[in-house]
């Protein structure tokens, strides 16, 4: 990838791997191309070609997600594989976040099928009826962020809830 422009680079936590996409101005390695590159081994672990330009990349230790205006795809680094994909209402911001619960279990938050503020939370591997859909706003969501609440909730002895919290925001307020 020497001499190529790259965008949306995400360092993989506790790793020498970086996930990034290309640039629309290039004839090869465009903004529809995604690469997971291991700097320690100096090799490409995974290269993906998508149908639409990539808007966002988020990564955890074992997984990464890429979003376009209408789709989210979740990949595992090892073995390199597509493990989950969702189609959603067109959203220029393509909000998405992921959080690992364990090295083989992950939660995904993304915009839903309704373009007016719907938030969808799902998991991999999926469990029957585990998908949660929330009407989070009256306008499109522009940002989604998970927060691991274990530490916070451990300090609240009367609260028996556990797991990640999720926050949303939009350009409309």
Which role fits each region the language model picked out?
Residues 3-11, 51-58, 89-106, 138-158, ...:
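Canonical WD40 repeat/beta-propeller blade segments in eukaryotic WD-repeat proteins
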Residues 18, 64, 108-109, 153, ...:
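Hydrophobic beta-strand positions that form the internal "hydrophobic ladder"
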Residues 21, 67, 110-111, 169:
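Residue-level marker for isolated small/hydroxyl-bearing positions within beta-strands
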Residues 31-43, 71-89, 114-141, 149-152, ...:
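Per-blade loop-tip surfaces of WD-repeat and WD-like beta-propellers in eukaryotic adaptors/scaffolds
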């Amino acid at each position: 990838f020497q001499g190529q422009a790259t965008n949306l680079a995400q360092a993989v936590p506790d790793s020498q791997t970086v996930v990034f996409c290309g640039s629309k101005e290039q004839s090869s390695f465009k903004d529809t191309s995604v690469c997971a590159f291991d700097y320690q081994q100096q090799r490409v672990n995974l290269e993906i070609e998508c149908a639409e330009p990539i808007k966002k990349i988020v990564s955890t230790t074992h997984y990464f997600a890429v979003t376009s205006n209408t789709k989210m795809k979740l990949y595992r680094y090892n073995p390199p594989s597509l493990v989950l994909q969702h189609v959603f209402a067109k959203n220029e911001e393509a909000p998405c976040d992921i959080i690992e619960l364990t090295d083989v279990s992950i939660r995904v938050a993304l915009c839903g099928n309704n373009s007016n503020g719907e938030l969808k939370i799902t998991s991999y591997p999926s469990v029957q009826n585990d998908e949660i859909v929330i009407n989070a706003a009256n306008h499109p969501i522009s940002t989604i962020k998970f927060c691991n609440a274990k530490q916070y909730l451990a300090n609240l002895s009367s609260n028996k809830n556990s797991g990640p919290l999720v926050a949303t925001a939009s350009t409309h307020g």
